[in-house]
Amino acid sequence: MPAPVSRAHTSALVLFSGGQDSTTCLAQALAKYERVETIAFDYGQRHKVELQARLNVLRELKSQFPQWAAKLGEDHLLDLAVLGQVSDCSLTRDVAFKMESSGLPNTFVPGRNLLFLTLAAALAYRRDLQVLVTGVCETDFSGYPDCRDDTMKAMQLALSLGMDKRFLIETPLMWIDKADTWALAESLGGQPLVELIIEHTHTCYLGDRIHRHAWGYGCGQCPACELRARGYARYAEAA
C-alpha cells in the first residue's frame, strides 16, 4: 500500500486549461498552498486559443496578485496529440454540436480526464507534489462520466496504488454551480479576479475571441458559452 500521506499538504499541481473553472481552482490553490505548479495538454482541440489564454491568465495573475506570484512554480504543457487521433467528437473534429444516442453531447472526449489525471500524477510523482487539483463538477456539467465524484475517487485510489504514492485529488467545484463559481472567484480575489476571468479566460468551444459579452468572450451559442452566461447572470443578479 502507498505510504501514509502527510496531513499538512504544502504544494499542489493544478490542471489548468485557461478557462473559468480551472482559473478559479488555481486561485484557490494559490490561496491555500505554499507552492503551486500548473499543467495543461495540447490534444488537438479545435479551440487552441485556450492554450494562449492560459498564458495570459498566468501573466495577469502574477502581475495583479503579487502575493500569489511568489507561489507560482513551473508551468508544464504536454503534447497529447494521440488523444485527438482516437477521439471523434466536436472538440477535436469540425462537426456541429449535437446529442449522441448515448445521451452524452458530442463534446465528450472519451478518456480525456482519465488521461489528464494519469499524466498529471506521473509528473507530480517526479515533482514531489501530492495534491492534484481539477475543476470537474457534477452540478453544472453535461453528464460527462469522467467529471463525476465517483470517477475522481476511483482515480485517486488507482493512481495512489499504481504509483505507490498517496495522491489527493481535490475538486473544489464538484458540488457548486457556475454562479457559485463566479462568487468563489470573488471571495478569493475580489472584483479584480472576477474581471481577470471575464477578460482573459476562455470557455467557448468555437474559440471565439471576437465577441465580447458581460461574462467574457465567446460565440454565445455553444453549450460552454450558454452555461457560462447563465451562471454569470445569476451571480450578477445576486451581487
Swiss-Prot record:
Its cofactor is Zn(2+). Keywords: ATP-binding, Ligase, Metal-binding, Nucleotide-binding, Queuosine biosynthesis, Zinc. Its EC number is 6.3.4.20. It is an enzyme of class 6 (ligase). Binds 1 zinc ion per subunit. ATP binds at residues 16-26. Gene3D superfamilies: HUPs (3.40.50.620). It catalyses: 7-carboxy-7-deazaguanine + NH4(+) + ATP = 7-cyano-7-deazaguanine + ADP + phosphate + H2O + H(+). Zn(2+) binds at residues 204, 219, 222, 225. One of its GO terms (molecular function) is ATP binding. Pathway: Purine metabolism; 7-cyano-7-deazaguanine biosynthesis. InterPro entries: QueC (IPR018317), Rossmann-like_a/b/a_fold (IPR014729). SUPFAM superfamilies: Adenine nucleotide alpha hydrolases-like. GO terms for biological process: queuosine biosynthetic process. The keyword Nucleotide-binding applies. Catalyzes the ATP-dependent conversion of 7-carboxy-7-deazaguanine (CDG) to 7-cyano-7-deazaguanine (preQ(0)). Belongs to the QueC family. This is 7-cyano-7-deazaguanine synthase. It comes from Polaromonas naphthalenivorans (strain CJ2). The gene is queC.
